Regions:
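Alpha/beta hydrolase fold serine-hydrolase catalytic domain that processes acyl esters and thioesters
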Residues: 2-56, 60-124, 128-133, 137-179, ...
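Short glycine-enriched nucleophile-adjacent loop
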Residues: 192-201
Length: 394
């Protein structure tokens, strides 16, 4: 078990780990599958099950998966890793103890990276004790390809990862004769929604709910499609109160905003989301999130697809030119990597450098405008509260 999580004030807070400790012995027959269970499985999908869970449909138990994983990876190794998803395997400790997930089985694990198509996708299917299955798509890992694919969502009608997600869901849906739940965290949420919208109709009929846990949205042509609109009632979108990733692009979903013990972008880590009994603690969206959402939305609206692609390719060129595969290499090799990165950056044509700087400057201006607009709204709201005329009119 990992150490307790504290909020910004240093107070102990309850997370999915506490949920498993409190409710892990409650079977689905007594308390049906709900939002916190979804996050547990979406986070568990970050676990590296290579060599443990087969891709051919062979089923293994949660206990077997846990024993195999911790025989290959020490707990000290995981705790030393600073990435947010490195702690996800510890979920198996509590899950394997209780009656809620203790009898769960794992199967059809895939973990694929295709540099040529700028695609990183991993998925796994969890067979739940209640007779349904949760198809989980992993979110963005520490790979350069994985992060670039996230940027590609802004200008491609369909990425290769999204296409592969449809294929995977169709394969699982055709093999399983049971209700399906589909979900994921971060990019995994995007893949879960996209695959569910555009999978075979016979598979879509089996889907009870689709969970996007702080997953980015889509191009408007996707959210305007008939398939997506038909899926909307089944989409459960959960974002932290200072969401950044989950408010990117379009979704048309009604977001469920939850409290996090972290600040800023660190709220993207689902293991910081706060739980009370068997539900998340819901709160209003923070002013910071509203400002970022307005700024990023305005910025992207002013760029066509070609400009978005130019920006993405230019930003990622130095990483690719140095042969860097993961961002952890920066901390591992420090100045050697930084020096190579700067040398590669000099190879970017001057006109593209200017275009990126122009776009970043535009982003800064829009951010300033959004903050000014928000503060002006606060002042006007305060004046309205203090105005006798306004009080009388109410």
């Amino acid at each position: 078990m990992i150490k307790e999580i504290e909020n910004k004030a240093g107070e102990k807070v309850a997370t999915v780990f506490d949920y498993l400790e409190w409710r892990g012995d409650v079977p689905f027959s007594a308390d049906p599958f709900q939002e916190v269970d979804n996050l547990v499985l979406a986070e568990l999908a970050y676990t590296d099950f290579r060599g443990i869970v087969p891709s051919d449909g062979t089923v293994i138990t949660l206990q077997e998966a846990s024993q195999s994983f911790f025989s290959m990876h020490s707990r000290e190794e995981l705790l030393a890793d600073k990435s947010f998803y490195s702690k996800c395997p510890f979920l198996m400790d509590e899950m394997a103890k209780g009656g809620r997930f203790g009898e769960m089985k794992l199967c059809w694990y895939i973990d694929e990276i295709d540099v040529r198509w700028e695609t990183q996708i991993s998925a796994i299917t969890f067979l739940l004790p209640g007779g349904s299955a949760y198809v989980a798509f992993r979110g963005t890992d520490g790979s350069v390809i994985g992060w670039k694919e996230d940027f590609n969502f802004s200008f491609l009608s369909e990425t290769k990862g999204q296409s592969r997600a449809i294929q995977y869901l169709n394969e699982i849906g055709a093999k399983l004769d049971c209700p399906l739940l589909v979900g994921g965290h971060s990019k995994g949420g995007n893949l879960a929604v996209y695959a569910s919208a555009f999978c075979d109709p016979a598979v879509r009929e089996k889907i009870l709910a689709v969970y996007s846990n702080d997953g980015p949205g889509f191009k408007q042509e996707t959210t305007d499609s008939e398939e997506y609109i038909q899926l909307l009632p089944k989409i459960v979108s959960i974002i932290p109160d200072t969401a950044i990733i989950g408010l990117l692009l379009s979704s048309k979903s009604t977001h469920r905003v939850v409290k996090s013990s972290a600040s800023g972008i660190l709220q993207h880590d689902g293991l910081t989301w706060q739980v009370q009994r068997n539900r998340f603690i819901e709160v209003p969206l923070s002013p910071t999130a509203e400002i970022i959402h307005q700024t990023m939305g305005s910025w992207l609206e002013q760029m066509d697809d070609e400009t978005r692609q130019t920006f993405t390719d230019t930003v990622f060129f130095p990483f690719e030119a140095t042969g860097m595969e993961t961002f952890s290499e920066i901390s591992d090799q420090k100045w050697k990597v930084v020096e190579s990165f700067l040398d590669a950056a000099k190879q970017i044509p001057k006109e593209k450098q200017k275009e990126v700087l122009r776009l970043l400057g535009q982003l800064g201006q829009l951010g300033t405008q959004a903050v000014t607009s928000y503060l002006t709204g606060l002042v006007k709201g305060k004046e309205s509260e203090d105005s006798p005329e306004d009080v009388q009119s109410v």
